[in-house]
Amino acid sequence: MIDREWMLEAYRLTRKDGAPGIDGVTAADYEANLEANLDDLQARIKSGRYVAPPVRRHYIPKADGTQRPLGIPTLEDKVAQRVILLLLEPVYETDFLPCSYGFRPGRSAHDALLALRAGFMSEGLRWVVDIDISKYFDTIDHTHLRGFLDRRVTDGVVRKMIDKWLKAGVLEQGVLSNRVSSAVRPEGHPKAA
């Protein structure tokens, strides 16, 4: 299912302007041998030899003075995540409600704001509740997540990749922790990566 065209498309769609992950590899470095790198990545994914590298922890300041931790994946991991997204997106996209905007094709935060504004204008609403759900990801039960995936994702390669990402660690100041939590979630989503 994953072929060279999928790999090239995944690379094309991956943001390449972000900071490098723990390997220090930039887009320019990776592109120096792009076809060979993508062929090697494809072979490792399909054979099960792909190892999800730890993400590099980085903090960004928030408006309230606190810091938001991010996990910065390697460029190659972003490409691997993107190729799996390309496979899963058509499977799950039809399940989403029209009022859902997060990380969906053809939708943006600006679209969500426009819909919110239109709803406020037509309904005469006056309140907005701002909720930060970032801590929610700390509580996701991986067994439940795997059960959810079991219902529609039967491809062993895809399942193994997801399991590897769920177990990937975090590198902070030279210290490796065993598991990613939302407190150190990978930067956004493959679409943002």
Placement of each model-derived feature along the sequence:
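Conserved pre-motif C helix in the palm subdomain of viral-like polymerases
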Residues: 67-96, 183-193
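Surface-exposed loop/turn segments and immediately adjacent short secondary-structure elements
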Residues: 1-47
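Residues at alpha-helix boundaries and the short loops/turns that link adjacent helices
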Residues: 1-5, 78, 90-91, 139, ...
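Short, compositionally biased low-complexity segments
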Residues: 2-18, 55-59, 85-91, 170-173
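Single, functionally critical "micro-switch" positions that shape active/binding sites
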Residues: 20, 25, 67, 131, ...
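Non-catalytic, well-ordered alpha-helical scaffold segments
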Residues: 5-8, 24, 28, 39, ...
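Conserved polymerase palm-domain catalytic core
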Residues: 37, 44-59, 63, 95-193
